[in-house]
């Protein structure tokens, strides 16, 4: 019976390759997550593609980008099947695109100021906000215990998943597609971030401003902590 089921599953995968990427990935989600919140996520996959404004040619890359390491304890897969490697790649792509954007947009700013701008745009807090905006949490594959513990709303998991998505888009569609996603979702937010008191590093900004005017560094006195 188990052999028949495996053969049946393999045939289903072969048949699904003839369908659209979205339909094929829906079938994958149903096979791997029948009893998890992902069973509802497959229904909204078209909406997810629309939100990220990208359709994957190889949907297995997207599947891996959504796979948190906790999920591997459920499937027994190798640790390399989680989204951590894609997260590393996406972090590098994000850093490149953001730095390139800042270099071109602010030709008169110092390296230190640009570094501060970059730190705002690649921050985990901002990436988590973006994840919530596109509804990414409901698609992330977690094991039951991580899901019950609120993993779908945990900022670190959401931010890592956004980086993994960027890495996946880069592998599937190239740098131009990854750059498009980053510009549509991240780089335009700089002025808004600069006005956010919780995100600004005022001490660093003051120091860089002094350096830009060839002044000595500011003197700090801590009155209380």
Q: What residues fall within each predicted segment?
A:
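Double-stranded RNA-binding/processing signature
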Residues: 1-225
């Amino acid at each position: 019976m188990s052999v028949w089921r495996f053969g049946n599953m393999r045939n289903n995968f072969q048949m699904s390759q003839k369908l659209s990427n979205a339909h094929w990935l829906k079938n994958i989600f149903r096979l791997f997550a029948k009893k998890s919140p992902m069973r509802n996520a497959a229904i909204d996959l078209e909406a997810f593609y629309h939100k990220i404004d990208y359709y994957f040619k190889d949907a297995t890359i997207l599947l891996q980008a959504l796979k948190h390491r906790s999920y591997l304890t459920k499937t027994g897969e190798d640790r390399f099947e989680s989204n951590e490697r894609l997260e590393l790649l996406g972090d590098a792509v994000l850093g490149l695109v953001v730095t390139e954007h800042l270099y071109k947009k602010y030709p008169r700013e110092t390296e230190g100021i640009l570094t501060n701008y970059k730190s705002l745009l690649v921050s985990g807090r901002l990436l988590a906000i973006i994840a919530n905006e596109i509804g990414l949490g409901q698609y992330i594959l977690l094991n039951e215990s991580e899901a019950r513990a609120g993993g779908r709303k945990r900022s670190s998991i959401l931010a890592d998943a956004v980086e993994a998505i960027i890495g996946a888009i880069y592998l599937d569609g190239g740098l131009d597609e990854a750059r498009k996603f980053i510009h549509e979702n991240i780089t335009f937010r700089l002025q808004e971030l600069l006005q956010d008191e919780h995100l600004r590093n005022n001490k660093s900004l003051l120091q860089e401003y002094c350096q830009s005017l060839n002044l000595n560094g500011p003197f700090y006195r801590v009155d209380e902590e």
